Amino acid sequence: MSKVGTSDSKNTLYCSFCGKSQHEVRKLIAGPTVFICDECVELCMDIIREENKSSLVKSRDGIPTPKEICKVLDDYVIGQSHAKKVLSVAVHNHYKRLNHQTKHNDVELAKSNILLIGPTGSGKTLLAQTLARILDVPFTMADATTLTEAGYVGEDVENIILKLLQAADYNVERAQRGIVYIDEIDKISRKSDNPSITRDVSGEGVQQALLKIMEGTVASVPPQGGRKHPQQEFLQVDTTNILFICGGAFAGLEKIISARGRSTSIGFGAQVLAPEDRRTGEIFRHVEPEDLLKYGLIPEFVGRLPVVATLEDLDETSLKKILTEPKNALVKQYQRLFEMENIELTFADEALGAVARKAIERKTGARGLRSILEAILLETMFDLPGLEGVEEVVISREVVEGTARPLYIYADRSDRAVENASA
């Protein structure tokens, strides 16, 4: 509402919610008898987003069903149906176990931590990030490559629980019901077959340190980080009900699996796993605990990851879908960028196929798609802000292959469009 002050400010308008004047805010929106500023509008939008997020996949008893979780994952992640099912069931069981563990004390339900194995760019991290977006439990991600044993330069294992505690706003009860995703878990494999050669503080030592918190223990967590503030009071966090999901590319594991297949194949009808003839994701389906042991994981660590989900290589069809179908698809992102210049960006179907083939050749999976599109659109994004009259840019297969330039279509339909398309 408008408030009247002194004679020099009698026409000054104020926000009816926070009381700030029109000079203190960027925008002041008028209603019949009230005013609201842009800051209050943004605050209201944040409140609505949080409510929508928490009610996204709720079902009876507040437990999201596996199908509901999987359906939301489908909106953001293309393919990997098996891994989605494993994650959806594990998360559903995690909720169900926590909600019903006090009702039947005769049978104690143990948690099942998950190991995700898949080639680079197959969607392991994206699956975890999407879970973080849709689940109403504290969630944190950790990078195994930064972890070391306590007392050495690097992050302590307890820092993972500290991050989860921070995600729960230091609410210990909520943190004890959370989910932790540890990425690059293959990078902490044992560096040598002989464990007594030297102390492996970033490999086997980290595996040993992770054992207790993954199985369940009461961890002493320093709220401000233990190394810089040694005198602070520690918080006690029980990790028994925290679900751990570990993911890694496990480069070279396919050779170990194939070697085992050759050594155990006897007779004319035996199947031989040949890495040169089969995709990495297909070979990962045959992984056994003994293969993980040979790779460098210690037996106790493998035993604490009873559920193993493997992700497949992404083929050309899947990569084309990744470019266009998810809600935050790369093509949609670049089209939005061009819309800011009032220009329509169009990709020919053959162009999307060429982009997918380039990613397959580079063996970078979906992670390499953005760098390919950046290289293709670099000159266009450099030129367009200085050009007038362009209403559409068309990317063809020849543009992706580097034999032609993008086609510029002008509003006046002049011959300049053809000139821009020439190599």
UniProtKB/Swiss-Prot annotation:
The answer, when asked if Kinase is one of the entry's keywords, is no
Recorded GO CC terms: HslUV protease complex
A Gene Ontology molecular function term for this protein is:
unfolded protein binding
| Residues making up the signal peptide according to the UniProt record | none
Q: Which UniProt keywords apply?
A: ATP-binding, Chaperone, Metal-binding, Nucleotide-binding, Zinc
Residues that bind ATP, according to the entry? P119, T120, G121, S122, G123, K124, T125, L126
Regarding protein family, the annotation reads: Belongs to the ClpX chaperone family.
Q: What is this protein called?
A: ATP-dependent Clp protease ATP-binding subunit ClpX
Which organism was this protein described from? Bradyrhizobium diazoefficiens (strain JCM 10833 / BCRC 13528 / IAM 13628 / NBRC 14792 / USDA 110)
